[in-house]
Amino acid sequence: MRYVFKNFTWKNWLCIFAIFCFTLIQVYFTMEIINTVGEITNATNSGTTTDIWRWGFWMIICAICMAIAQIIIQFFASGTAASIATNLRRDFYKKVNDFALSDLAGFSTESLITRSTNDIQNIHMAFIYAFRTIFVAPITMVWSIIKLVKTASTPMTLTTIIWLVLLIAVVVVLMILVMPRFNKTQKLMDALNVSSRENLTGVRVVRAFNAESYQEDKFEVVNAKYTKLMIFVGKAIALFTPFIMFVMMGLTLSLLWVVSFIINGQDISAARPFFLSSTSFVMLATQIVMSFVLLITIMILWPRACVCARRIKEVMNHSIAVNDPKESVDFTEKGTIEFKNVGFAYPGSEKEAVSNISFKVNQGETIAFIGATGSGKTTIINMIPRFADATSGEVLVNGVNVKNVKQETLRNVIGYTPQRGFLFKGNIRENIAFSNPNLTLKEIQEAAKIAEADSFVSAKSEQYESAVAQGGTNFSGGQKQRLCIARSVAKKPEILIFDDSFSALDYKTDKIVRANIKNGLPGTTRVIIAQRVGTIMDADQIVVLDKGQMVGLGKHEDLIHNCPVYQEIALSQLTAEELGLKKGGK
């Protein structure tokens, strides 16, 4: 929780000071009401009707002032807590947005969602309650104790202490039972989100294998654990409310019994003053107990908020793998990419996933990567836009080491189409114009035509205003890929990266789209990862990868004769005649 306090703004502290000031006003008028009750009680014994009316009118004024102070406290408490939660959520979102791929691997998507929503909401609610009571409880308690000292009665004081000790003992037991379980509830909440998200995103596979019962059983195991834990915590906290009422009523009855015991046998004229003063004592004792209850409630809520704050702190204090340089340099070239003996190892791995990768691409050229699954193709291209940093060697874009350029500047010159096409909820126009919302409809249509997407978009009733579901689930795989390609093309970058982005297209459309890109963006450098040899045959350079090593570099015509790995891949897809090879693969 210390992290949250460190991030308070001066406005937050000013509001907290205002809460403190109005709390003093509230407690003052609360004590005045108790004093007035005593004065009215005395007036009924020895005063006049005028005195009673006068004190009654003063009590009404005190009650109104106390209510106004409480309303103002609620206003500042709610506003300050909301401000703290808003700042936390904004900072959390910014931090996660800066994460590299390796950073995201350390936190599951479900956990990050839970932390940014449920955890921050728990902190928000804890602060609302804390701001309402953190000053009221101790100030009321101290003020009441001071007044009790003035009207001290040893038996009544001891009675009050006994009930307070009982209350504290029960609370200590309650906290010992409940506190350790708060951390478990948050972890189980993460697990519930994982199970729910997995079932929803994989719904087609689940139904195809008739695995609904299996998925339900998996969910039920986690749900049962979470339910059992929450029932225990809920029961423990639920028992606290009636116990408070028991303490309050028990204290009042005990004090009245002590009073009756003390005045028993005394003369009425002698007993009456003590009985009347005991009324104020009972009210003050009740205020002390209520103050304890408020503090205890905070103590119950606070541990859960602390667990949530610790989870937020884990993310906020996480050291990001990819950072901007202190001083950025300008590009010296345009549309060039160069790898110099580049190697990359994933965090926690001693062995490099790729090593000794060297090549150079000039502006307007096409370089392609091919290799078996897990050979390191995506790992290599992830280092171009700095989704990950090389652990050895240098990656240069436009003549400059990518580590010496701000990530924003670097990515401004790169258009990236991922392996799995992803579209954002909204409409087609917004998705294609994702890099620049100010693109005209004509520019959007041109990009769609290059990606061969204009035909199916124009066939829709709303055309480019047609709705897009989250993730683009209302489009086929091929349509989704073409829209993603159009999004990259619309950016008109210096470098275009296609991470197996033609895999869902038929051979004819694949060839047309690549030709459109080459003709429509002649000065753009193209980086292509593909599994199909037909997609990369016309590339200026082809990098052949095998188990993280570069085993071939050149044109298709050269590699098909002198690179066994490339030849093996090619022959698995096309015949020797189609590849222009003689019988025997020569």
Name these PLM-found stretches:
Residues W10-K11, L101-S102, N118-F127, F131, ...:
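An intracellular "coupling" helix at the cytosolic face of ABC transporter transmembrane type-1 domains
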Residues K11-Y28, E32, Y129-T185, L256-I268:
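Transmembrane helices of ABC transporter permease
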Residues G47-T48, W143, K147-V165, M175, ...:
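Helix-loop-helix
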Residues F92, V96, V206, I312, ...:
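Helix-loop junctions and hydrophobic alpha-helical segments within the transmembrane domains
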Residues V96, F219, F339-N341:
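Conserved catalytic Walker-motif region of ABC-type ATPase nucleotide-binding domains
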Residues F331-K586:
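ABC-type nucleotide-binding domain
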